[in-house]
Amino acid sequence: SKGVQDYFKETYDRDTIFIPNGVNKSILREPNIIKQKYDLEKDNYILYLGRLVPEKGIKYLIEAFKQVKTDKKLVIAGGSSDTDTFTQELKELAKDDPRIIFTGFVQGQELDELYSNAYIYTLPSDLEGMPLSLLEAMSYGNCCLVSDIDECASVVEDNALIFRKSDVIDLRNTLQKACDTPSLVEKYKSEASVFICDKYNWDDVVDKTLELYEVNK
């Protein structure tokens, strides 16, 4: 990310070249597997998809969502990268809200279906590098809700909903506003894919990488 590039300059006085992750427009899928497994349908759930680790802000998300008045579900998809202790903490926090679903690790068509049919994709992280999951979510045409850390905000610019990091109340209010205002969500959905696929086009990333190798032969 640009933040990492700045860190190397400030800490080690090293000049670096920033080449971001890339993404292409994704093919949308009907909710077949996720309908059978979790009773999920188009636009009836909010999605977090990523590793279940503390720095991703999932605790804030659960705490905020439990205060939101909505029939929509919260789907937390992904596995833990270390022990299952944190995952169990999350499940304990969520156990009194039947709207919250943990899917575990997902891949393939199930992952595609989750991205394709979410009402909102959210990444409430305290710490990120270059969040590929955010690029992927926008490539599926999702309205995204992210924390205001630079690594997320600089990716989405003004094309997503943003809340103050670590602020459960602000996250709750932003979630509630999104659930109450489908027209706002649809606006972001309609612009997401074109914006992100133009800004982080894989062909451009490949060209920049090849150019760098040629210069340094």
Model-inferred region functions:
Residues 3, 22:
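Carbohydrate-associated surface elements
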Residues 6, 73-99, 110:
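Short, structured helix-loop element that forms part of the nucleotide-activated donor/catalytic region
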Residues 39-56, 62-66, 75:
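Conserved donor-binding/catalytic core segment of Leloir-type glycosyltransferases
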Residues 105-106, 113-118:
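Short alpha-helical donor nucleotide-sugar binding micro-motif in glycosyltransferases
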Residues 126:
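Aromatic "clamp/platform" in nucleotide-sugar-dependent glycosyltransferases that forms part
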Residues 143-146:
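Short hydrophobic beta-strand element within catalytic cores of glycosyltransferases
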Residues 161-169, 177-183:
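Conserved acidic donor-binding segment of nucleotide-sugar-dependent glycosyltransferases
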Residues 184-199, 208:
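A short, well-ordered alpha-helix in the C-terminal region of glycosyltransferases
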